[in-house]
Amino acid sequence: MISYASTTRSITVIVRPIYLDEPSDLLGREFAFGYAISIENTGSAEVQLLQRRWIIQEANGSRQDLTGDGNLRPHPVIPPGETHVHNESCTIESFNGTVKGNYLVQRADGEQFRVSVPPFPLHAAAN
């Protein structure tokens, strides 16, 4: 499985996307994808994930802009040297697309900043 990674201010985000045969419906133009996400804190202060934003661009020109908690309830705290892992999914109407985005995080001192999610492709039947 191919991984995509980016680091912002000592927070590394690694994404591993996969096409999901089930529940995809080729005739109904519904293509489902899952992605495992690892968020590693290599800094010296703990951070808490507050929000995520996904921008999903489909090959047919359609775009989804999703902002909110997603699968981040309760809001995970990641101590220095630790990694938080969770899964997300989406359904698109095209065979192909791309996803990019960011996480809003907060340090223990209250400082908030955005951590980039590496852009990654969605390719139907690419498994």
Each model region followed by its residue ranges:
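Short, solvent-exposed loop/turn segments enriched in Ser/Thr/Gly
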Residues: 30-36, 99-100
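Intrinsically disordered, low-complexity Pro/Gly/Ser/Thr-rich segments with frequent PxxP/GP/PP motifs
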Residues: 65-96
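Asparagine-centered strand-capping/turn motif at beta-strand->loop junctions
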Residues: 39-43
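Short beta-strand segments
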Residues: 11, 47, 64, 111-115
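Short acidic, flexible loop segments centered on an aromatic residue
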Residues: 45-64, 105
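Short glycine/serine/proline-enriched coil/turn segments at secondary-structure junctions
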Residues: 25, 46, 93-97
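Low-complexity, acidic Ser/Thr/Pro/Gly-rich terminal tails and inter-domain linkers that flank the onset
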Residues: 1-32
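Terminal connector regions
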Residues: 3, 91-127
